[in-house]
Amino acid sequence: MANNVVVLGTQWGDEGKGKIVDLLTEDAKYVVRYQGGHNAGHTLVIDGVKTVLHLIPSGILRDNVKCVIGNGVVLSPEALIKEMKPLEERGIPVRERLFISEACPLILPYHVAMDQAREIARGKKAIGTTGRGIGPAYEDKVARRGLRVGDLFDMEAFAEKLKEVMEFHNFQLVNFYKAEAVSYEEVLEQAKGYAELLTSMVIDVTDELDAARKRGDKIMFEGAQGTLLDIDHGTYPYVTSSNTTAGGVAAGSGFGPRYLGYILGIAKAYCTRVGAGPFPTELYDGQEKQDPVGKHLGTVGHEFGATTGRLRRTGWFDAVAMRRAIQINSVSGFCLTKLDVLDGLKELKICTGYQMEDGSVLEVSPMAAEAFEKVTPIYETMPGWSENTFGAKSLEDLPQAAINYIKRIEELTGVPVDIISTGPDRNETIVKVHPFES
């Protein structure tokens, strides 16, 4: 039995991780975020009520769950407070159930200003960041000049460190990007306003999680974004700034890697991507590519980013990219989401290989974005189905063509599909194998 489960995306993000984490946390004591920031967007629908979380772990809607933000997360105090308010208005005791590592780097206004100024300067070569300061905050962390949650315990020392780092960033903003400087006084006053709140939620995350493990408590690690956006293993440079893969769990939470039991990879029954970067099976981008099937996927699937509101690019399921994700994460089983979006399509295609310019065929996706952009997808065509799968709760409720599609994905990837999502509500799910019971 796996007491410690990792839930992560195996595509380009937006796979539906939030719903699945919420579903599985019925049996969990802890839900831990270990990377990313408020660039994530996890949408939960419970009894018809929609909740979008960007920073707070998805387990916050469960009374039995303690939520933890690990050291691998870059934390925006402004975003956290904004997210806490509507939850507390609904009677959810966030301050009693949310805990933060003192080692979390802070995202401050100058990070946001720097992020946005850079994207403007890149012009047509823009990466497509959310503009929320994630990348610059991670840069400061690696450069060892970043401020962390723990620095808020000593505001006098915080003020000195802040002044030094802001001189560095403001010089770049004004002289290189021709943007306005960020006010030191305003940033400091804001920090004084939230210091007490943040420090009151600080715990020793490593010690807390290790004690939970020894007690036999079930722990869920909630990933953000997706494997193909990983800073090291994704389609670089069109990636995020953190390790979105299973390897990021230990580093981003301080939890021993040997204790991780089950890796649940979340994948849509098709593919989507937000922002720039290669996408071999792309059908629709709202501009140059206007395939009607791709438009169907985007419209029926409501493919707009929960964080940015941007239209997602859509395409066929890519088993080649999925094999890379399986290698990197040692995926135990899949959760296939949005199966119901495929309802009504006469035929479906699955990418089974990439043909290169020299005629060779790749069965696993390449590392570099440049190589990705040169591949031609090789497709296998399968019959679709006209029946309605929305809300199905058992395999018996699915048409045979849908079952065949799922089985083919299992054959092509070598990994079982243990969970199938057929709608946005936590109840609209088929659970073949429960990760905590595997």
UniProtKB/Swiss-Prot annotation:
Subcellular location: Cytoplasm
Entry binding sites for GTP: 13-19, 41-43, 312, 338-340, 421-423
Binding site for substrate: 306-312
SS bonds (residue pairs): none
Pfam families: Adenylsucc_synt
Identification of the protein by name: Adenylosuccinate synthetase
Pathways per UniProt: Purine metabolism; AMP biosynthesis via de novo pathway; AMP from IMP: step 1/2
Catalytic activity annotation: IMP + L-aspartate + GTP = N(6)-(1,2-dicarboxyethyl)-AMP + GDP + phosphate + 2 H(+)
Superkingdom as given in the UniProt entry: Bacteria
Family from the record: Belongs to the adenylosuccinate synthetase family.
Cofactor note: Binds 1 Mg(2+) ion per subunit.
